[in-house]
Regions:
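Bacterial Sec-dependent N-terminal signal peptides
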Residues: 1-30
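Subset of outer-membrane beta-barrel
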Residues: 27-312
Length: 312
């Protein structure tokens, strides 16, 4: 019993460290692939089923996946002084690249059930949720945020882009142990339910600052943006679809977009202390119902005034 408590303490310590590292690193992936002290993360590799004969997973207690990638490290923008750590805006502009990418992916088991039959066969069923967000911002936008618009009469923003998606997956999985348990292979077949999809096709804005409006800086904005949206976001772009959402909400939410996908994974125990594994997950596609997809197009001009921020 004490040994199990010690293992759980070690596991919690590792999780806390990973969360801290995630906030500072440019690229991280947090997965639990082969833990005997907790339910294994079959989400990352369907061949990794652990030693349990039966598993029941619920949100927060089973498989999870958290990944983030960026072209910069948050720790590069931190300063420490007087025992305090804070963001240094002075570092923003010098560290900005021509393109600054940010990508984040989250996956979680909403429910999972697995059972081992005759030692070598493992069957599983479950529901997973996945969310992903991607943004790309130019160094001009970073400099505008860090330095303000007072010293920059005109800024052209045409390299910005964004992508986001959400979907659920109902899966059936199978894994088998081979070669005296040294080799494990597994796969999952998924029924995909699309929830949201958004992507920009074209962004082109010009911000021009008036140098004569004192004390406020008047900013004129001209340009255009084209984007595509589907699912709940797609309905938000169409007033008719938005009004009809509540008329049959269950049917609408289950028929916005559907598709098929699969996962495949292998794991090989080279020695008692060394194992190697590989997997391909979330391979598939979703076809969106045209009644729940729309295009967003914004063309025009605008003007706003910024009088500054008062600080002590």
């Amino acid at each position: 019993m004490l040994d199990k408590i010690k293992k759980m303490k070690n596991l919690l310590s590792i999780i806390v460290c990973l969360i801290f590292i995630n906030a500072l690193s440019a690229q991280t992936g947090t997965l639990g692939l082969a833990s005997k002290a907790a339910i294994p993360n079959m989400m990352a590799n369907p061949a990794q089923t652990g030693d349990a004969r039966m598993i029941i997973g619920l949100p927060g207690l089973s498989s999870y996946q958290v990944e983030q990638q960026s072209s910069f490290k948050l720790s590069d923008w931190l300063n420490t002084s007087g025992g305090k750590t804070y963001l240094s805006f002075d570092k923003f502009a010098p560290l900005a690249q021509q393109r600054n990418d940010i990508n984040a992916n989250i996956g979680i088991d909403l429910f999972s059930f697995g059972m081992r039959i005759k030692k070598n066969n493992f069957f599983s069923i479950g529901v997973q949720h996945f969310s992903s967000v991607y943004m790309s911002i130019s160094d001009d936008l970073v400099k505008l945020a860090a330095e303000g618009n007072g010293n920059t009469p005109s800024v052209v923003l045409n390299e910005e882009s964004a992508y986001a998606s959400q979907f659920n997956a109902l899966y059936l999985g199978y894994s088998r142990n081979l070669m005296d348990d040294k080799l494990k292979v597994g796969f999952r077949v998924k029924r995909l339910q699309g929830l949201n999809h958004f992507q920009t096709d074209n962004v082109n804005f010009t911000l021009t600052t008036s140098q004569t409006s004192i004390p406020a800086y008047a900013v004129n904005v001209t340009g255009s943006m084209k984007a595509q949206a589907a699912g709940i976001l797609g309905m938000a772009t169409d007033s008719v679809l938005s009004n009809n959402l509540g008329s049959n909400i269950t049917s609408n939410l289950t028929n916005m977009g559907n598709g098929m996908g699969f996962d495949f994974g292998v794991s090989y125990q080279v020695t008692d202390k060394l194992s190697v594994s590989a997997s391909a997950v979330n391979i598939g596609s979703i076809s969106w119902n045209k009644d729940f997809a729309g295009k967003v197009e914004l063309v025009g001009t605008g003007k706003f005034e910024f009088s500054g921020i008062t600080t002590d």
